Amino acid sequence: MSENQQHTPSAESSAPSQTLPAHPTDAQRPLLTDEQLAHLPAQHPLRAGTAASSPMLQALTGRPSSHRPVWFMRQAGRSLPEYRRVREGIPMLEACLTPELAAEITVQPVRRHKVDAGIFFSDIVIPMKLAGVNVDIVPGKGPVLDRPVRTLEDVRALPELTESALDPIREAIAATVEMLGDTPLIGFAGAPFTVAAYMVEGGPSRDHLRPRTMMHADPAAWHELASWAARTAGQFLRAQIEAGASAVQLFDSWAGSLGEGDYRRYVQQHSAETLEAVREYGVPRIHFGTGTAALLPAMHEAGADVIGVDYRLPLSAANTLLNGAVPLQGNIDPALLAAGPESLYAHVDDVLAEGSAAPSHVVNLGHGVPPTTDPQVLTDLVRYIHEKTTN
């Protein structure tokens, strides 16, 4: 028994059950319509496997589940010693575009922690890289473009992403799905604003001043750039779904830098374009951003089926903002992972109680797993959540 287990509160203590029960007809109706299923390949897990009945897919679609499902953003990464071993000497983008390596990295946290879903190991700049944009990930800094995109001429010079360029993604997804078995895979892409912000800045930024200025100073260039980012993200997600992903998440890491007015005027339509690109498949579409409490209704209106909530806003407050209309995901504070078992589990109990207000709740962090996290903390946390919320 680990030290964390010795100090873990009993999972038999007052445990919130899996959220408010769905209407009986919700639980009985098929996860996907015949028309939606027709868009998926015959071998897709939602057609040929048990993914549709998994706790993750049940919760993502607002249905009761056998326990509160859990996965972690950045669960595949530097917190795992096995990840560090297989990545040794291999640049990030090369790892993402090597199908067998991307598949292995995706499966590692499922194998170790017994989380309820894998999240595809990739990066938000992969679609632009595959399109032919000269971008690299610099260790200790992040994505850096050889040439920032700051004028309408720059935007119109951008190459379009071809379907054949996505073949490594399809191959990686197919291999991952086979390795995961009954555990569903979540695909992902960077949202148009966050991707476009990187492209305008040429790299990471604290305030995203250049893209926010561009929206107002040159709205034509901004909208063309954001539309390009929306198209490539849509293609990226479609390829993942067609190869076997059972849900997708659109990450808008930097949307919290925007006011609601600018979000609705300059961003929402482009996120909607990406989410609309995969609507026909019927898979759950999760939308997550950091610092986006004021934007949650607008993010839902863009077409999200599930809203991810960061650690700054209680889930009950998010549920109120969204009129109780949408499943929620989140929102354990990553800082608590290193705060000791007593503080962590008290916080987790609060998150579970808050999540019970929503139509359904998928447990996650309110941001990514910090690289310094002790993996055993996550393994014990998954076990605790499963035991505490089992019906």
Which residues fall in each region the model found?
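N-terminal small/glycine-rich loop or linker at the start of catalytic domains
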Residues: R63-E94, I124, K129-K141, L145-T151, ...
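N-terminal basic, low-complexity leaders that serve as flexible interaction/assembly modules and, when applicable
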Residues: S2-P139, Y345, P375-N391
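Active-site loop segments of alpha/beta catalytic cores
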Residues: A165-N391
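N-terminal start-of-chain detector that recognizes signal peptides
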Residues: P41-P45, I90-P91, A157-E160, F236, ...
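The substrate-binding groove and active-site-proximal loops of carbohydrate-active enzymes
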Residues: E94-L97, V155-L166, P334-A338
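A gly/proline- and charged-residue-enriched helix-loop-helix capping module
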Residues: G140-E178, T183
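Glycine-rich, proline-tolerant flexible connector loops at the mouths of alpha/beta enzymes
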Residues: I119-D136, V149-T162, A189, A245-Y263, ...
